[in-house]
């Protein structure tokens, strides 16, 4: 086998390896993208639900404040003031819990995305190792054949 023939074989083999790398890399990237999109979609849905709860809590505080302002007698104003303070305390507490839950959801999503990124990077490293091994095996087989000839 001539040097030119060996170079032709290696060029063809490199093209095959590059096509395989491109295909598998594309699969890895698509799987990663789907995971990240699913994480972000779930996060958005959960946050939207929590924001609705928060808005309801704020609306309840506003209703109590309006009732206090619109009270017609001093006695009723005092009662509405007490009610408003109670409602405000409860709803502010609820809002703090909601904010904390949103922060926790974001943290968990960030960790999940980091795990997906690490998994993707690991799969890409494995792919590179497999392709390198195939390349090295082909080079060895060509050298062995060259020695036999």
What does each of the following model-derived ranges do?
Residues 2, 6-9, 13, 17-21, ...:
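The feature captures the hydrophobic core positions of alpha-helical coiled-coils
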